[in-house]
Amino acid sequence: MQIFKGDFSATKGIPPSGLCVGVHRAGAIHQKMVAKHGDHLAVWSLRPDLDFIAFKKEGLGEQGIRSTSEMESINASSEKLIYGVRGAPPEIREKAREKGLTLLADATCPFVTQQEEAELQLLESGCHLVVLSSRTHHGIPRLQGIAREKGKEVFIVEREEDVEGIRLTRFEPIGVIVQTTFWLETYKKIMARILERFANVQIRNTACIDSLQRLPEVEKLAKQVDAIIIFGWTEGMTNRMLEVARAFNAHVHKIEKVDDLQLDWLRGKGKVGIIGANETPDWMINEAIERIKSMAA
């Protein structure tokens, strides 16, 4: 059996791996803060469970850095604050100020910041929002709350047929935002339908460079193997990768940990591909490859 690993780097100077540009950058910030300030560091994160995976392998947890989604648990007198890669909503930042926490660094992905700024600009200009995104994306409730305060609606569009559910007249102002992990091919089809239905449309393509390059790599890999394994969690990028892979390969599987691998997936397959989602460290992908080798032996 041949095993093919999806490897690429969306940015020069960053070695190929499973991690996206934003997560790689956040990890470097964490390391720098530990080296500079020592222990008693708290990362406020929307997904502390994913941070824990990286911290465990890098030994950061043993060096006094922890991740939490509970601002109340951070001790202002003994811990210093870092915002995680997914950012922190305004109400969390306000709580941190009220507690008197010392903010050492903001590791929010620049593409997430770019998207949030575009959302606010469109709302301030009087637009309702159409967001090309999965409905379960963690940022949707926050955005809906902001829009309600401004008397605007938010419509989530995952596929072409969802455009019919946008309950607005042809000439009402619409601002289109693209979730950072959205697939470009789906974006093109949806936008064609939106522009056909509506006449007053502003578009902010906030898809990140990592998505634009990772998803074509999934397509390339899916076309050349008998089965493909996506190593990631049930979030935007993983779902997009599964969507792309299934368009080109009938044998697509998802794992969240190495123990999820199943021998039945490998039987009769001469070529197997594996690629990590944007928060899957390279060491985890390599462990999965070694497990596949041992299972196929």
Short names for language-model regions:
Residues 1-297:
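The feature marks the mature, well-folded catalytic cores of soluble enzymes
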